[in-house]
C-alpha cells in the first residue's frame, strides 16, 4: 500500500527530530570529524547546519534547507527571493510539500507556501580530496503535484555522488500567468533556477564539486531539467545556465507534449482561475491583487478529473497537458526581467542553446500501461467495443495532434503521409479480444507521448556536434516499489482499477507488461515514508543488480563531466547516439547496447519514408500493412552481438557491489554480417 507522503505536519516532525539538533544558545563544541555538522562562511554570513549521519552506510543527510524566502503576500506569483545560509540551522526534518490537492481526497488541499527547501545526501564531509559530483533532482508530477520526501539518496551516496532534491511551487501558484511582467509565469522554474544557484554557492561545504552538477528530473521534472539547460537566462562564466554541466531526463524532455503549454493556454487558465475564485479577470492588476489576498487553498485547483468522457480528455491527462504549467515567455526586450523559456524548446535546440551540455535521456518500456490497463481501462474497452475503428480514427487522430507539439522536428517528406494509424489498427484487428486492444493503445500512446519525443530529443540535442546525447530504455519489471508511491495522483502512475485489471489477467487475458511510468524510480532512490524511513520490502538479487546498474549509470555520467579540464564532454560512452547508428542502452536484468530504437515505429511517427521502405521494417510490419511503394533506397544498420558488460561502478569509492551475472547476447537485427562486429565497448564503462 502506498504510504501517504503528503500528511506532513511540521510541528510533529520537528518534535520527532533527534535531541542532538542545535537550535541556538551558546556555541557548541567543535564536532567530531565524522559528525553531520557543516560550517559555512559565505556572502559575509556565518552558518552552522546540523544534520543526520547514517552509521550503517556512512552517508550524511541535511533536510529542509531553505533556499528562498516564503513566496507569500506580495511575493506570491513572483520570482523567488534568495535566502542565504546564516545562523544555527536544524537540518534534521523535511519541509512541508508545496500546496497541492491531496491525491487521496481531491477536495482537500495539503502543504504550505513556505516550502522552498532542498535536501542534501552526501557521501562524505569536505576534505582535501576532490569534491563529489552532484545530481540535482527535480521531482515529477505534471507541474501540479509532488514532494521531495519520498526520494531517499542513499544509493547514489554509495557511488561517491551527492544528491540534492528541491521543492518548487506547483500548479496555479507556480505557473499562473497573466502575460504581464508582474505575473509572467514559470515561477516554479525560477524556483529551481534559484535552488541551482544555491547549489553552486554552497555545495562545496557539503563535500560537493560545483563544477560537476547534473540536473536530473523525471516526467515533468525531466522536461524542467532540459529547459534549464536550454535557458539563456543567468548564464555567466562558462556560459551554462546555473552551472548545469549535464542533463539526465527520465521519461520526459523539453520536447514532451506536456513540457510547455500552448500559446493560448495560460490566458485561458487565468480566466478560469478568476471565474473559480470570484476575482475580476480584467484588468490583470486587479486579478493579481485579488488573488494575493486569498488563502492559498482557494487558488490551488482541487478538481481532479475522475470520469473520462472523451478521447481528448484522456490524452490530455496522460500527456501531462492539463492544468497550469511552464510556458514560453518570449524573447528578452529589456523592458522586463529576462525570461527563462524564451522560445519553443525545438527552436532552442536548433539554435544549439544546449551548447556543450551532454544529455542522458530515456523511457520505460511500457510508460502508459498502468493508466491504460488501470484507471482508464473501462473507458477504453467501452470505446473499443462501441466505436468502429476506434484506434485508427479516434485515438490515432488525437495522438497525431498531440505529437504536433514536438514542433518542427518531424522530418518533412514529400508525398502522402505514411500509414501510421493503419499500423496500430492492424495490430488490433489481428488480435483476439479487447484486452489485446488495450495493449495496442498502450503501445501507441507510449510511442507518441514518450518514445518519439525522447528519440527526437537525442537527435536534435547532438545535431550540431557540440553536445553528446545518450538514450536508454528501462525494461526491467521487478518487485520494488512502483511509481504510484513517488507520483501519487499522477494518472500515468495511478494504480486505478488494479484489482479489475488483475481479474482480467486471471481470466486468461493479456495484461500490462514491462515497467510503467515512474517504476524506474525505486531503482535510483530509496522509497521513504512521510517520516523519512525506508518503506522496506523484499529486494531480490535481480532487483539489487538492476538498482546497482541504474544508479551506476547515473553516477558515472556525473563523474565524467570533466571538472579538471573544464570540459563537459563526458567519456561515459564511446558510442553516443548518432544518426548512423542510433545506439541506445537497454536496461533489464543486465545492461546491453542495442541499435535502432523502435526503428520502424519511429519511422512511422517521423514520417521517414525511406526507413519504412527498407527490408527491416518490411519484416516488422509487412504482414500487417500493404505498404505504398517507396523509391528511396535505405541502408539498415545492423545490430551485432555485444560483448559482456563489466560491473558498472566497480572501482568508484564506496562501491559495495558484486559483478553482475553473465549477460545474454543481443540478437542481430538481420542475418547480414556487419562490417565491424566490435562496437568499442571497452570505453563504455571504462574504469568502473
Role assignments for model-derived ranges:
Residues 2, 14-189, 210, 368, ...:
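Non-catalytic accessory segments of hydrolases
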Residues 60, 113-116, 190-197, 223-226, ...:
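A structural signal for well-ordered alpha-helical segments within the folded catalytic domains
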Residues 355-357, 438, 460-467, 477-478, ...:
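Alpha/beta-hydrolase-fold serine-hydrolase catalytic core, especially in secreted/extracellular enzymes
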Residues 4-10, 22, 64, 105-293, ...:
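Serine-hydrolase-like catalytic core of hydrolytic proteins
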Residues 255, 297-542, 560:
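Substrate-gating cap/lid region and adjacent catalytic-acid/histidine neighborhood
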Residues 497-499, 506-509, 629-688:
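Extracellular mucin-like PTS segments
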Residues 57, 61-67, 71-84, 373-395, ...:
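Short Gly/aromatic-enriched secondary-structure transition segments
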Residues 67, 77, 291, 521-523:
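Bulky hydrophobic/aromatic "packing anchor" residues in well-ordered structure
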Amino acid at each position: 500500500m502506498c504510504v501517504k507522503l503528503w500528511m506532513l505536519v511540521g510541528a510533529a516532525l520537528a518534535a520527532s527530530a533527534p535531541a542532538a539538533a542545535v537550535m541556538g544558545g551558546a556555541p557548541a563544541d567543535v564536532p567530531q570529524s565524522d559528525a553531520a555538522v557543516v560550517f559555512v562562511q559565505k556572502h559575509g554570513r556565518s552558518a552552522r547546519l546540523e544534520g543526520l549521519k547514517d552509521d550503517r552506510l556512512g552517508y550524511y543527510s541535511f533536510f529542509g534547507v531553505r533556499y528562498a524566502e516564503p513566496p507569500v503576500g506580495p511575493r506570491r506569483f513572483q520570482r523567488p527571493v534568495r535566502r542565504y545560509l546564516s545562523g544555527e540551522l536544524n537540518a534534521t526534518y523535511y519541509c512541508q510539500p508545496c500546496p497541492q490537492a491531496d491525491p487521496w481526497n481531491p477536495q482537500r488541499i495539503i502543504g504550505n507556501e513556505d516550502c522552498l527547501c532542498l535536501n542534501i545526501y552526501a557521501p562524505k564531509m569536505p576534505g582535501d580530496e576532490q569534491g563529489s559530483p552532484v545530481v540535482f533532482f527535480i521531482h515529477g508530477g505534471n507541474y501540479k503535484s509532488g514532494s521531495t520526501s519520498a526520494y531517499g539518496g542513499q544509493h547514489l551516496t554509495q557511488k561517491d555522488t551527492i544528491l540534492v532534491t528541491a521543492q518548487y511551487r506547483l500548479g496555479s501558484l507556480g505557473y499562473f500567468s497573466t502575460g504581464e511582467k508582474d505575473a509572467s509565469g514559470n515561477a516554479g522554474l525560477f524556483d529551481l533556477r534559484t535552488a541551482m544557484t544555491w547549489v553552486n554557492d554552497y555545495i562545496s561545504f557539503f563535500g560537493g564539486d560545483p563544477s560537476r552538477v547534473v540536473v536530473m528530473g523525471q516526467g515533468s521534472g525531466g522536461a524542467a531539467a532540459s529547459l534549464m539547460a536550454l535557458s539563456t537566462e543567468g548564464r555567466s562564466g562558462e556560459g551554462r545556465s546555473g552551472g548545469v554541466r549535464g542533463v539526465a531526463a527520465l521519461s520526459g524532455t523539453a520536447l514532451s507534449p506536456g513540457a510547455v503549454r500552448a500559446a493560448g493556454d495560460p490566458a485561458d487558465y487565468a480566466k478560469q482561475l478568476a471565474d473559480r475564485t470570484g476575482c475580476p479577470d480584467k484588468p490583470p492588476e486587479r486579478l493579481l491583487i485579488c488573488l494575493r489576498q486569498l488563502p492559498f487553498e482557494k487558488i490551488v485547483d482541487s478538481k481532479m478529473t475522475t470520469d473520462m468522457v472523451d478521447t481528448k480528455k484522456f490524452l490530455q491527462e496522460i500527456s501531462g497537458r492539463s492544468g497550469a504549467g511552464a510556458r514560453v515567455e518570449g524573447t528578452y526586450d529589456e523592458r522586463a526581467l529576462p525570461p527563462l523559456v524564451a522560445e519553443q524548446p525545438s527552436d532552442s535546440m536548433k539554435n544549439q542553446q544546449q551548447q556543450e551540455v551532454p544529455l542522458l535521456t530515456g523511457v520505460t518500456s511500457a510508460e502508459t500501461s498502468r493508466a491504460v490497463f488501470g484507471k482508464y481501462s473501462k473507458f477504453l474497452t467501452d470505446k473499443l467495443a462501441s466505436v468502429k475503428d476506434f484506434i485508427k480514427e479516434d485515438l490515432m487522430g488525437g495522438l497525431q495532434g498531440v505529437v504536433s507539439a514536438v514542433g518542427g522536428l518531424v522530418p518533412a517528406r514529400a508525398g502522402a503521409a505514411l500509414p501510421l494509424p493503419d499500423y496500430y489498427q492492424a495490430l488490433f484487428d489481428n488480435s483476439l479480444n479487447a484486452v489485446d486492444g488495450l495493449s495496442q493503445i498502450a503501445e501507441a500512446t507510449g510511442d507518441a507521448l514518450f518514445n518519439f519525443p525522447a528519440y527526437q530529443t537525442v537527435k536534435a540535442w547532438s545535431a550540431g556536434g557540440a553536445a553528446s546525447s545518450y538514450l536508454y530504455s528501462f525494461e526491467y519489471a521487478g518487485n520494488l516499489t512502483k511509481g504510484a508511491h513517488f507520483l501519487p495522483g499522477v494518472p500515468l502512475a495511478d494504480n486505478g482499477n488494479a484489482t479489475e485489471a488483475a481479474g482480467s489477467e486471471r481470466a486468461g487475458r493479456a495484461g500490462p507488461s514491462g515497467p510503467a511510468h515512474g517504476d524506474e524510480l525505486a531503482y535510483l532512490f530509496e522509497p521513504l515514508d512521510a517520516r523519512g524511513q525506508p518503506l522496506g520490502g523484499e529486494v531480490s538479487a535481480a532487483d539489487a543488480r538492476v538498482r546497482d546498474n541504474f544508479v551506476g549509470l547515473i553516477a558515472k555520467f556525473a563523474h565524467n563531466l570533466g571538472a579538471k579540464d573544464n570540459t563537459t564532454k563526458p567519456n561515459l560512452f564511446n558510442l553516443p547516439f548518432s544518426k548512423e547508428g542510433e545506439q541506445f542502452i537497454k536496461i533489464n536484468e543486465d545492461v546491453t547496447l542495442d541499435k535502432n530504437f523502435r526503428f520502424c515505429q519511429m519511422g512511422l511517427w517521423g514520417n521517414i519514408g525511406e526507413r519504412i521502405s527498407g527490408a527491416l521494417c518490411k519484416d516488422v510490419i509487412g504482414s500487417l500493412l500493404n505498404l505504398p511503394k517507396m523509391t528511396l533506397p535505405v541502408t539498415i544498420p545492423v545490430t551485432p552481438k555485444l560483448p559482456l558488460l563489466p560491473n558498472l561502478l566497480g572501482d568508484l569509492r564506496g562501491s559495495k557491489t558484486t559483478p553482475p551475472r553473465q549477460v545474454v547476447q543481443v540478437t542481430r537485427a538481420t542475418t547480414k554480417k556487419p562490417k565491424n562486429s566490435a562496437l568499442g565497448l571497452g570505453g563504455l564503462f571504462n574504469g568502473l
